[in-house]
Amino acid sequence: TNKKGLCGLRNLGNTCFMNSIAQCLSNSQELLSYMLSNKFKGELNEDKEEADLVNNWNILVRNLWHKNATYTPNNFLRSVQSLAIMKDRGQFTGFQQNDSQEFLQFFLEMFHNAVCKEVTMDITGKPRNDFDKMAIDAYKNYVDFFKNDYSEIVKLFYGQFFTRIKTIKDGKEECSRSFEPFNMLSLEISKNSDGNYDLESCLENFTKVENLETDKENTVKYKEVKFWSLPRILV
């Protein structure tokens, strides 16, 4: 076949947790384009200790997409192990099996640290309605988190939750709201109305209204979580 990206990765010990994440990320088109276009080179801070990981990731990705064969990611693994020692993440310093989700979190964090930069984020215009006010609050939250260290990883992998707490006491209702960034979802596996499992049912279950316990008399409290914005790559 002439199709690219059909390259396999050899395990180095029990490193299938790393290889599976590498294959998933290398087939994420937005992140792949960021690497193959060399855009990352203009943002990479070579003085940072995480830079070696990104450079070896670049080599790994190009080998995965250069020809259909089997590639041994020795240098990439060594950069992971070296950085794990520096960051006191002992689970990634050897050749033992590990959790793929934990490795993905570690890799994205290190990648972000290597290419992040301070950016200017301004809020302009006046709110015309309640939705505009919510949008401003959401953007302020986004600015607070990322104005000093924004990166392509944030752009691709981060979304925002919108959480509303409703309290009803003696017939009077009060609401509070907050925004929070996220880059991974932990979903409970849920069946749909047909008895089958699907992603939509899992997301609906994640965002259902929750009745919160309270020790106050004549008081009812509810919590509702919604997605304000979704990342381009949802994990």
Which residues fall in each region the model found?
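UBL (ubiquitin/ubiquitin-like) substrate-recognition surfaces
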Residues: T1-V235
